[in-house]
Regions:
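Acidic/histidine-rich, surface-exposed loop or edge segments in extracytoplasmic proteins
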Residues: 71-90, 200-211
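N-terminal, intrinsically disordered, polar/charged segments of Gram-positive cell-envelope systems
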Residues: 22-67
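Positively charged n-region of N-terminal signal peptides that target proteins for export
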Residues: 1-4
Length: 335
């Protein structure tokens, strides 16, 4: 009887115990495997985003020749900074420009490549302006060539590896020449949902620069012809009151909406059609045959103002203070 009972117990253990044992082992193995995959995935993301060696060299498309050249990143940045910002600007402004250019380059490579065969091009209307050392030196006065180039190289080298991040990721670091006293949000320029770090901020000292003010005067027929090129249905009666009227302004004090005859257009479109330097303008119609646009600022107005950066540097701000003024809630990190 005891023997029978013993074998029954053994049989029960074999039938129920072993499956339970293997089931637990299988679940534990799966759990560990999942954790390892997640860790590996995170490590790969970190390497992709922050391994500086990955960006030691870039492929640069020369738009005019259509040739693609592979060059060291820092050498490329020398060409960008020297093409985009005057060497006469303050050192801290040049450093800020170097970090902005580096960030913009890496953001483009990771998120917004426009060229299949290259990382970025040398056309400022598409990517960033770039100029070779030889061409840049040739355009400077001989007496200033060495000192100017040394300032450019120092701006890039002294900020080596530094980029601007928002929540740990490289930002889309837009910049422009002169904000006219206040920068703009991306939503008011290009639409879309915008970026939280590209908000409208005030900038002092820009009125001292030649880019701050400009004027465009057109006779009425030229004005009509230019708008009709884009909008064939355009009609206007200059004898009526408010035939041209600004309807709404943006946070950055630019024209958001403007009534022009029978059309309602954005300030950005009027800027493009008429070749204005900014969408921050006022319209003056006198008794003559002319229409004058008085413009403040130069460029789209989004991100860092270059003259604003130089003005801040002259007032004692360093590159970090400049960057954090123009880009809201960002950090400067090493890649």
């Amino acid at each position: 009887m005891k023997k029978i009972l013993f074998y029954i117990i053994i049989f029960v253990i074999i039938c129920f115990g072993i499956p339970i044992l293997f089931t637990n082992k299988k679940d534990n193995t799966k759990e560990v495997s999942t954790i390892q995959e997640n860790v590996q995935s995170n490590e790969q993301n970190e390497i992709k985003e922050y391994d500086y060696k990955q960006y030691n060299k870039i492929k640069l498309l020369h738009k005019q020749s259509t040739q693609v050249e592979e060059i060291p990143l820092d050498e490329y940045l020398y060409g960008v900074v020297s093409a985009e910002m005057p060497a006469s600007f303050e050192k801290e402004a040049l450093k800020a420009q170097a970090i902005v250019a580096r960030t913009y380059t890496i953001y483009k490579i990771q998120n917004a490549k426009k060229h299949e065969e290259a990382d970025i091009c040398d056309d400022s209307t598409c990517c960033q302006a770039w100029i070779s050392k030889e061409d840049r030196l040739a355009k400077w006065e001989e007496s200033a060539r060495q000192s100017n180039w040394e300032k450019i190289v120092d701006a890039v080298d002294s900020t080596k590896g530094k980029i601007i991040t928002y929540e740990g990721k490289p930002i889309n670091a837009f910049f422009h020449s002169n904000s006219g006293g206040k920068t703009e949000t991306t939503v008011n320029v290009w639409g879309g949902s915008g970026y939280p770090y590209l908000q409208s901020v005030s900038t002092s000292g820009e009125e001292a620069y030649t880019q701050y003010k400009s004027e465009v005067t057109l006779n009425k027929q030229t004005f009509i012809d230019k708008i009709k090129e884009k909008h064939n249905e355009f009609e206007i009666d200059f004898g009526t009151q408010d035939c041209i009227k600004i309807l709404e302004y943006t946070d950055g004090e630019r024209v958001k909406k403007i009534k022009v005859g029978n059309l309602e257009l954005s300030g950005v479109e009027i800027r493009t059609i008429l070749g204005l330097k900014s969408a921050n303008f006022e319209v003056i119609m006198d008794e003559s045959d002319n229409i004058t646009f008085k413009v403040k600022g130069y460029g789209h107005g989004v991100g860092m103002s270059q003259t604003g950066a130089d003005s801040m540097a002259k007032q004692g701000s360093n590159f970090e203070e400049i960057i954090k003024h123009f880009y809201t809630g960002v950090e400067i990190q090493n890649i």
